Swiss-Prot record:
GO terms for molecular function: DNA-binding transcription factor activity; transcription cis-regulatory region binding. It holds the Pfam family MraZ. This is Transcriptional regulator MraZ. It comes from Geobacter sp. (strain M21). NCBIfam families: PRK00326.3-4. The gene is mraZ.
Length: 160
């Protein structure tokens, strides 16, 4: 599973290096060096403001997600919600393989959507990797501090 946060950069052409640890997990845990890069679900910050990150899904994890979205009404989504999820996650998805140096080219439209400029963060999220700009990551961390369930029985049940 993907764990940890790795800080890196993205160049003016949109190239960035996938952290070596995450490339290793793609191959060793998920059995494939291929992955899909797409837009994240909306990150709601400060009321109505919405930001996006990017997400790396291991190849077969993304295919499983596509299968689940074939009949999203079984997930309790309305037809309109399902269409929005498909347009947000599936439409911008690109299949990728890092080059021999571990680099990948992030398409311009995805870079703009996620506001990726220079400093970026790769964040391990179990079966996927989130990618955030420095500014969006700082705001996500602020939200996490506010939303963290301090006195939760669920956390106690997890041993936290």
């Amino acid at each position: 599973m993907f764990r940890g946060k790795f800080d890196t950069t993205i160049d003016a052409k949109g190239r960035t290096s996938i952290p070596a640890k995450f490339r290793e997990i793609l191959l060793d845990t998920f059995g494939d060096e291929r992955f899909f890069l797409t837009k994240s679900s909306p990150v709601r910050l400060d009321g109505d403001q919405v930001c996006y990150g990017l997400v790396i899904y291991p190849y077969h994890e993304f295919l499983a997600l596509e299968e689940k979205l074939k009949d999203g009404t079984a997930l309790g989504l309305t037809v309109n919600q399902l269409a929005s999820v498909r347009r947000t996650i599936l439409v911008p998805a690109v299949e990728c393989v890092a080059d021999k140096l571990g680099r990948v080219l992030v398409p311009n439209d995805l870079r703009k959507t996620a506001q990726l400029e220079r400093e970026i963060h790769f964040v391990g999220m179990q079966n996927k990797v989130d990618i955030y700009s420095q500014a969006v990551w700082a705001r996500v961390c602020e939200q996490d501090e506010q939303n963290f369930p301090v006195d939760s029985a669920a956390l106690a049940g997890l041993g936290l």
